[in-house]
């Protein structure tokens, strides 16, 4: 088991940069040779390496090849096939290059609590934070944003507008409100994000970068990656 895990981890490192067709054939060959517990170990390792945003090998395109293999393979049961299919469909939601799925959220203004839609959130770039209860990354992202002077300057200039939506019962305390000063704080009161699974929150809180038309530019990303991306766009 440990050997298979290590081999798959090393293999994932080699897959990056390979043409998609080559990667597809290589992944299929690696899985076709396995069965039983060894196969399940390989699949779980692929998931940990390719579908965990914290992994250096994170790549949803490659992970979708794993799901496609599960769907078509005779080595997995029907329940696993269905689960793979549903996950692959969800991967297509809010994918990079697609329009972010719209949702209703509640926020406060001078008149009290009001309903707003993501699609009506006006900004050249939107930093969308979907905050999950008990996940500390919401605060970590806010702190990282403050530390990154160039990126925080874009926030002050309203070129980049943070929209922080709380998807659970937790509400921001005074510390978070201070850290997200200048951001729009919203709440998933209609439960469209969680109940209808409009966004994948299986990893916990999620961070997206959207353009003015709400096209997804980056997802499951980080503050440094957003800064690098926007700097490159400005250089174009």
Predicted regions span which residues?
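A structural signal for short secondary-structure junctions
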Residues: 121-122, 155-158, 199-203
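Non-catalytic, surface beta->alpha helical segment in thiol-disulfide oxidoreductase systems
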Residues: 203-206, 212-236
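Oxidative protein folding and maturation machinery
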Residues: 1-113
């Amino acid at each position: 088991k440990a050997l298979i895990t290590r081999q798959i981890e090393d293999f994932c490192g080699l897959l990056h940069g390979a043409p998609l067709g080559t990667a597809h054939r290589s992944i299929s060959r690696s899985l076709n040779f396995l069965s039983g517990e060894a196969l399940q170990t390989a699949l779980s390792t692929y998931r940990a390496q390719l579908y965990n945003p914290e992994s250096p090998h994170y790549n949803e395109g490659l992970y979708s090849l794993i799901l496609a293999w599960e769907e078509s393979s005779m080595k997995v049961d029907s329940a696993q096939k269905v689960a793979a299919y549903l996950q692959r469909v969800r991967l297509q939601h809010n994918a990079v290059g697609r329009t972010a799925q719209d949702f209703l959220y509640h926020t406060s203004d001078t008149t009290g609590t009001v309903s707003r839609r993501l699609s009506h959130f006006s900004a050249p770039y939107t930093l969308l934070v979907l905050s999950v209860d008990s996940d500390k990354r919401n605060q970590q992202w806010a702190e990282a944003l403050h530390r990154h002077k160039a990126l925080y300057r874009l926030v002050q200039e309203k070129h980049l507008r943070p929209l922080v939506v709380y998807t659970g019962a937790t509400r921001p305390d005074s510390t978070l409100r201070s850290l997200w000063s200048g951001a729009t704080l919203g709440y998933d009161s209609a439960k469209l994000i969680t109940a209808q699974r409009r966004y994948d929150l299986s990893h916990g809180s999620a961070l997206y970068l959207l353009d003015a038309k709400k096209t997804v530019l980056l997802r499951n990303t980080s503050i440094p990656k957003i800064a690098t991306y926007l700097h490159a766009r400005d250089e174009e």
